[in-house]
Regions:
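Conserved acetyl-CoA-binding loop-helix of GNAT-fold acetyltransferases
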Residues: 88, 94-107, 131, 135
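Conserved beta-strand-loop-alpha-helix junction that forms the acyl-donor binding cleft
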Residues: 120-130, 146-153
Length: 166
């Protein structure tokens, strides 16, 4: 059984580590490396503070009594809430946890009056996440963020988007 538990201090160290790994996963998609380093840990601590002092909620994901990740929900102005960040430990992926977490996050959002839609984002390189979101009824909006690295990296920037090689 998968549950969301409101983030609390007892989860701080492991959540900082997971945020750093989450940044590493994103970096791996973009830069070809996902190794946590001191600067990523520092950024993770800062991010945790921001997530717990803003307009959102941070939950740890508990599956079969094990803490296996986190989900961050942001209640922005207007009627759209955002599932900003979802992270499931690599060893627990492919077991349906993210599917259950999204459903639980949707229930949390529905409990807040006035929200009529939910958005989330994924890198075009993260095909597994995009496939999951589409399977769960999310549709791709027309806005695409593009990015240029100002320093050299060895990652080949080949992306397929909507069946078109970019």
């Amino acid at each position: 059984m998968t549950k969301l538990k409101k983030f609390g201090g007892k989860y701080k160290d492991e959540t900082v580590e997971r945020i750093a790994r989450y940044f590493g996963f994103s970096a791996g998609l973009h830069f070809g490396t996902d190794k946590p380093d001191e600067s990523r840990m520092k950024a993770a601590k800062k991010t945790l503070k921001e997530w717990t002092h803003g307009n959102g909620e941070l939950f740890v994901i508990v599956d079969k009594k094990d803490t296996v990740g986190f989900v961050h929900i942001n209640y922005r102005t207007g009627n759209t809430a955002w599932i900003e960040d979802i992270y499931v430990d690599e060893t627990r992926r492919g077991q349906g946890i993210a599917t259950r977490v999204i459903g639980l996050a949707e229930d949390k959002i529905k409990s807040h009056r006035g929200y009529t839609s939910i958005c989330l984002e994924a890198s075009p390189d993260n095909k597994a996440a995009l496939a999951l979101y589409h399977k769960l009824g999310y549709v791709t909006l027309g806005m695409i963020t593009v990015r240029k690295e100002i320093y050299k990296n060895d990652k080949k920037n080949e992306t397929e988007l909507f069946g078109t090689d970019l």
